[in-house]
């Protein structure tokens, strides 16, 4: 099987980001964005998706969390797009419902080459740790755009920590399922068009 890894860097006046991704990893992760709860969520994504991930971001957190979260989403999405490559043999579609106590996240993904993001729901508290709750949805919108995937997400619950964590775990599981190699496809692109 082809090596499905990528390394992406992004440097702007607002952030300096470095990301590595291995789609066929073991869930190993090293994450340092300066936002503890966001680090925890990226670790949950890696662990539950069985992706080996490193993320380092030095951002302008003295302004707010927006640039850091968005630019990590850009870099991780770009790394995903590079790592998945021509998408030969992948499952392509997947869906997961993941609970965390009272909260439930629903995730549907199509590794389609088309960037679409829909989010249904909201977060019960405006912040969790140093993360503005709505930035969790914005992160996945940014990821979907730069990964060129269709991603439909929803959350329901009473505790924003649980809602966001269920969302990150759910995306990890769904993306892992969608990128798994199906031996029956024998390296073919999963599309009637022959290309994604």
Swiss-Prot record:
Protein name: Imidazoleglycerol-phosphate dehydratase
InterPro entries recorded: IGPD_sf, ImidazoleglycerolP_deHydtase, ImidazoleglycerP_deHydtase_CS, Ribosomal_Su5_D2-typ_SF
Cleaved signal peptide residues: none
UniProt KW Nucleotide-binding keyword: no
Domain of life of the source: Archaea
Pathway stated in the Swiss-Prot or TrEMBL entry: Amino-acid biosynthesis; L-histidine biosynthesis; L-histidine from 5-phospho-alpha-D-ribose 1-diphosphate: step 6/9
Protein's gene: hisB
GO BP terms: L-histidine biosynthetic process
Keywords: Amino-acid biosynthesis, Cytoplasm, Histidine biosynthesis, Lyase
Coiled coil residues, start to end: none
Enzyme class: lyase
HAMAP family named in the record: HisB
One GO cellular component term: cytoplasm
Family to which this protein belongs: Belongs to the imidazoleglycerol-phosphate dehydratase family.
Native species: Halobacterium salinarum (strain ATCC 700922 / JCM 11081 / NRC-1) (Halobacterium halobium)
UniProt keyword annotation of Cytoplasm present: yes
NCBIfam families in UniProt: PRK00951.2-1 (NF002111), PRK00951.2-4 (NF002114), PRK00951.2-6 (NF002116)
EC annotation from Swiss-Prot or TrEMBL: 4.2.1.19
GO MF term list: imidazoleglycerol-phosphate dehydratase activity
Matches recorded under Pfam families: IGPD
Localization per record: Cytoplasm
Catalytic reaction annotation: D-erythro-1-(imidazol-4-yl)glycerol 3-phosphate = 3-(imidazol-4-yl)-2-oxopropyl phosphate + H2O
């Amino acid at each position: 099987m082809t090596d499905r890894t990528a390394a992406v860097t992004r440097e702007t006046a607002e952030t300096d980001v470095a990301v590595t991704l291995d789609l066929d990893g073991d869930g190993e992760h090293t994450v340092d964005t300066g936002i503890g709860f966001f680090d925890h969520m990226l670790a949950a994504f890696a662990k539950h998706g069985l992706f080996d991930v490193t993320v380092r971001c030095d951002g302008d957190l003295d302004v707010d969390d927006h640039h850091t979260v968005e630019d990590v989403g850009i870099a991780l999405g770009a790394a995903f797009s590079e790592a998945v490559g021509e998408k030969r043999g992948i499952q392509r579609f997947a869906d997961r419902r993941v609970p965390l106590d009272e909260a439930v996240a629903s995730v549907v993904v199509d590794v389609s080459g088309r960037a679409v993001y829909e989010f249904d729901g909201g977060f019960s508290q405006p912040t969790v740790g140093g993360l503005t709750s709505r930035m969790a949805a914005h992160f996945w919108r940014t990821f979907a755009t730069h990964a060129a995937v269709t991603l439909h997400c929803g959350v329901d619950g009473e505790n924003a920590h649980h809602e966001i964590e269920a969302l990150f775990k759910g995306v990890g599981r769904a993306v892992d399922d969608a990128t798994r190699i199906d031996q029956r496809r024998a390296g073919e692109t999963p599309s009637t068009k022959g290309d994604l």
